[in-house]
Amino acid sequence: MNILVVGSGGREHAVIKKLRENNEVKKIYALPGNGGIAADAECVNIGATDIDGIAEFAKNNQIDYAVVTPDDPLVLGCVDRLERLGIPCFGPRKNAAIIEGSKVFSKNLMKKYGIPTAQYEVFDSAEDALAYLDSAPIPTVIKADGLALGKGVIIAATRDEAKEAVVEIMRDKKFGKSGDSIVIEEFLTGPEVSVLSFTDGKTVVPMISSMDHKRALDNDEGLNTGGMGTVAPNPYYTKEIADRCMKEIFLPTINAMNAEGRTFKGCLYFGLMLTENGPKVIEYNCRFGDPETQVVLPLLKSDLLTVMRATTYGTLAETPVEFSDKNACCVVMASKGYPVAYEKGYEIDIPDEIRDSVYVAGAAEKNGKLVTSGGRVLGVTAVEDTLREAIASAYEKAEKIHFENAFYRHDIGAKALAATEEK
């Protein structure tokens, strides 16, 4: 089989490495891929949002199956386009990807179908939003309606911060059209949990839960990032909570999308907050999370391609999906200065003996060498029997990788470890 994978991050590298375990897979193309992915797939310089280019390439290269993982091409209708060419895909169509593409849509969906989430108001005028903030409870959360590279959510600790966020998003157009409307919502507290799931629009199979670390610096300080590391499973996510989420959140979401004529197939990501009043949805993503994928897929015992195809063809209920009972930890190594300004072009040295555990993101190939080209450069994952061992092993591997201006958090998994050892 010839497989096409759209995207260029560590998440795509994790997907590609897992797909390679299937003997039917003869060739994997990554569009555009990156310098590190080039060791595991043929990278083709067609951007993830160049839907015409992707379709043209797929048509001319006998692609048997396509995996579309980034949010932008999904929201732009990449899957619809490839399906029209007769190419089966993993990922939702455009009318279902809106669950991530529009915060206003997803909040209204939850309200309409009684899915637990934070209280909220929607505004399409800055004046109205600013007036509302004069008396709104603080802290509060401001969300741009559309996609904003994961940067469109601002937690405002003061009224002034909240108003500043509204002005930046709606008047200064910090995120362009994505900020034409905003959601202002209640600030929830409690442990956060990421749950990725496979779904064919009828059956939902949750993957192993994980805990992301969004802030750039230790002790959850610094700016928000795309994610600086993850551990799986998440110790706060007990069987009792998982059962409750299936009944109150996961299945109701799939059923709500069906009722709206927007059947969702692919990977649906649930960002959850475990509040005193039970689990609530903070966000939906219409695809694998990054770096959650880098801990969840290494724990998947079943064949990934088989499970993906089951979501496409509606046979997930008959397809066994098994996960290891081990623990995984991923530490993200970034360029100093991320997520603001950082230098690029530094050579990356990864010892051969740990290469299988490394998922490359912001790196390019230059004169036969791998060099830094992005903020989050790579993630290194360890799978061990216990969480403590997985964390220690991931850091041991990270210390063996070298590039100029590298930095990473030193407390990935510390909170999870404390929770595990409290039990």
What are these regions (language model features)?
Residues 152, 156-293:
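Internal nucleotide-binding/catalytic subdomain
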Residues 21, 36-38, 90, 112-114, ...:
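Solvent-exposed alpha-helices and their adjacent loops that cap or buttress functional pockets
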Residues 1-94:
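ATP-binding N-terminal substructure of ATP-dependent carboxylate-amine bond-forming enzymes
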Residues 67, 78-93, 98-117, 121:
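Glycine/small-residue-rich loop that forms an oxyanion/phosphate-binding "nest" at active or ligand-binding sites
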Residues 246-268, 285-353:
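Active-site "cap" helix and flanking loop/linker of ATP-utilizing ligase/carboxylase catalytic domains
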Residues 310-423:
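Peripheral (often C-terminal) accessory segments that flank ATP-dependent C-N-forming ligase machineries
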Residues 4-5, 100-181, 235, 239-251:
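Active-site nucleotide/adenylate-binding loops and adjacent lid/helix of ATP-dependent enzymes
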